[in-house]
């Protein structure tokens, strides 16, 4: 996460998760480019990797490394969570390329 609005998005997610029975870790890894921002263990003990993004207009600014990570991990519990105004949209990893190209005009699955 590189910009203040994404940091604010993370803080709001962290606040919301604090009242759940999930376990989460924010990943800050500059050595493995494209690694998602959040590792989440849900109440069913399944892990999820989640990239957090804030839309700029309709655009979702995913780096080529982030898209590549999603493409490599499609079919897994890897996601892109996008905030646009008051809406929060959850996209599967296999939608990353289309999300990069179409932005939030793309329908989440």
Show which residues each predicted segment covers.
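Acidic-basic catalytic patches of nuclease active cores, encompassing PD-(D/E)XK
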Residues: 1-29, 43
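Beta-rich catalytic cores
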Residues: 34
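Conserved catalytic cores of phosphodiester-cleaving nucleases, focusing on short active-site segments
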Residues: 38-40, 46-56
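Short, flexible beta-strand-to-coil junctions
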Residues: 43-44, 55, 82-87
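Mg2+/Mn2+-dependent nuclease catalytic core
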Residues: 56-73
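Nucleic-acid nuclease catalytic cores
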Residues: 73-98
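Helix-rich interaction surfaces within compact, conserved domain-sized segments
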Residues: 96-109
């Amino acid at each position: 996460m590189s910009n203040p609005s994404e940091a604010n998005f993370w803080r709001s997610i962290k606040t919301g998760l604090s009242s759940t029975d999930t376990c989460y870790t924010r990943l800050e890894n500059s050595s493995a480019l494209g690694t998602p921002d959040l590792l989440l263990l849900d109440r069913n003990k399944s892990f999820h990797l989640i990239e957090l993004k804030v839309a700029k207009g309709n655009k979702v600014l995913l780096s080529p490394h982030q898209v590549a990570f999603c493409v490599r991990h499609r079919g897994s519990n890897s996601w892109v969570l996008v905030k646009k105004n008051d809406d929060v949209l959850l996209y599967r990893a296999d939608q990353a390329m289309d999300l990069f190209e179409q932005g939030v005009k793309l329908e989440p699955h």
